[in-house]
Amino acid sequence: RFSPSRWWADVVATRATVIHYLGVVPPLLLNQPVAPEERQHKVKFGMGAGVEPDLHAVFEERFGFPLIEVWGMTETGRILADNKEPRQRHTRAFGRPAGGLEAKVVDDQDRELPRGNEGELLVRFAGPDPRRGFFSGYLKNPEATAEAWRGGWFHTGDVVRQMPDDMLVFVDRKKNIIRRSGENIAAAEGEAVLQAHEAVAQVA
């Protein structure tokens, strides 16, 4: 069980060289008092998703290893990663399409959007079989499988932006987008503002 106060001691004791993180972990560790163990570890890098852009470089500079932002789903059978320097640490970037994976960003009518616009991330394998390497389907739910694969692309449910250089930038889960006065507001953006306040220990 994760404990911010014991975490570095556990990392040092196990001689871990790679760690996995969720977005809630970096602020919890940064809020801990400086301890000698946090610089006695052998960690080469961390991989995960959801580190707040304002904390990304701060974490790396304090603890001495990079946090590699990745994206993946059980259904896709592969990941994307922002693992090539210079990494885009202040943007929620998680990499460019690679490894035979094609990606595009669409609106609610599945129309492809221009670069830089927020929309749902769709992915598929580049080749005669777009489902190659993906899951075979949702258990006993062929309707949900067909809906996810409509138009020959897998609908991830993630809202992203694809930049002119092909970099994909995470915004939020589609179900977490708040509609207000005609605007799409990512819940993660509001949570980031709250998390930055010194009186807030954790945001859920």
Indicate residue ranges for each PLM-predicted region.
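AMP-binding/adenylate-forming catalytic core of the ANL superfamily
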Residues: 11-12, 19-22, 109, 123, ...
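Active-site glycine-centered loops adjacent to acidic/histidine catalytic or metal-binding residues
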Residues: 72, 95, 158, 182
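Active-site phosphate/pyrophosphate- and oxyanion-stabilizing loops and adjacent acidic/basic residues
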Residues: 27, 53, 57, 92, ...
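Adenylate-forming AMP-binding core of the ANL superfamily, especially NRPS adenylation
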Residues: 50-53, 82, 89-140, 148
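Glycine-centered tight turns that cap/initiate beta-strands
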Residues: 42, 64, 100, 144, ...
